[in-house]
Swiss-Prot record:
It is found in: Nucleus. This is Homeobox protein HEX homolog pha-2. Keywords: DNA-binding, Homeobox, Nucleus, Transcription, Transcription regulation. Pfam families: Homeodomain. GO terms for cellular component: nucleus. The gene is pha-2. One of its GO terms (molecular function) is RNA polymerase II cis-regulatory region sequence-specific DNA binding. The keyword Transcription regulation applies. SMART domains: HOX (SM00389). It comes from Caenorhabditis elegans. Transcriptional repressor. Involved in pharyngeal development and required for the formation of the pharyngeal isthmus. Plays a role in modulating cytoskeleton in the muscle cells of the isthmus. Regulates expression of the acetylcholinesterase genes ace-1 and ace-2. May regulate its own expression. Transmembrane segments: none annotated. Residues 124-183 bind DNA. It comes from the Eukaryota. The lineage of its organism: Eukaryota, Metazoa, Ecdysozoa, Nematoda, Chromadorea.
Length: 214
């Protein structure tokens, strides 16, 4: 009896105890295969996270920790989007229109890049000041009577034509230069026939000695 009891005691000690495994309340971390399956089920999230995969040089599919954190973040963002009324069922931060964002970024620069868009037609174009027909006619009419303007007359004329005093002064300077050039060209044309006749007569006398003694 003692020996049998002793053997049974040994067998009982050698037999592994059938204890229930401890259950953990924490959710297990998904492995790489589970992560890839969950990502493939959500095509929208997979497409949006494609640039992030390239940033990690392909390590995102094989790192369960990064995959687990990414899934939790995406789930939280999706849940926040569902709680908002009228919000689409996708990640709000990843659903951004890139073209619209770039357009809004460039809008404040338009006035700085293209200052000529806000200028009136008589402003500079091609390096020259453009005047309207009414302004040109008024300036020509004033130039016919006054080749030079006093500061008071220039200020009054500029105000009546919606121009600056500098523009009026520059126009009169250019107009006087053109007027002198036209006058000089006209005087040269008037002198050309007389000069040509004198030269012709001199050549004729030198070629015919009898005319020189007449």
């Amino acid at each position: 009896m003692d020996q049998k009891f002793y053997i049974s005691s040994l067998l009982q000690e050698d037999t592994p105890s059938k204890e229930k495994p401890e259950t953990s309340s924490e959710s297990p971390i998904p492995t790489g295969s589970e992560c890839s399956l969950n990502e493939s089920s959500d095509t929208t999230l997979d497409q949006k996270m494609e640039p992030n995969k390239k940033m990690f040089n392909g390590t995102l599919d094989f790192n369960p920790w990064i995959c687990h954190v990414s899934q939790q973040l995406a789930a939280q963002l999706s849940q926040n989007g569902k709680n908002r009324p009228g919000a689409p069922n996708q990640v709000p931060l990843l659903n951004m229109n890139v073209n619209q964002t770039m357009g809004n970024m460039w809008d404040p620069r338009l006035s700085w890049l293209y200052p000529y868009m806000s200028k009136s037609p008589q402003k500079r174009k091609g390096g020259q000041i453009r005047f309207t027909n009414e302004q040109t006619d008024a300036l020509e009419h004033k130039f016919d009577s006054h080749k030079y303007l006093s500061p008071q007359e220039r200020k009054k004329l500029a105000k009546s034509l919606s121009l600056s005093e500098r523009q009026v002064k520059t126009w009169f300077q250019n107009r006087r230069a053109k007027w002198r050039r036209v006058r000089k060209d006209g005087e040269d044309e008037d002198e050309m026939p007389n000069g040509a006749s004198a030269r012709s007569l001199g050549q004729l006398q030198s070629s015919n000695p009898f005319l020189s003694h007449g």
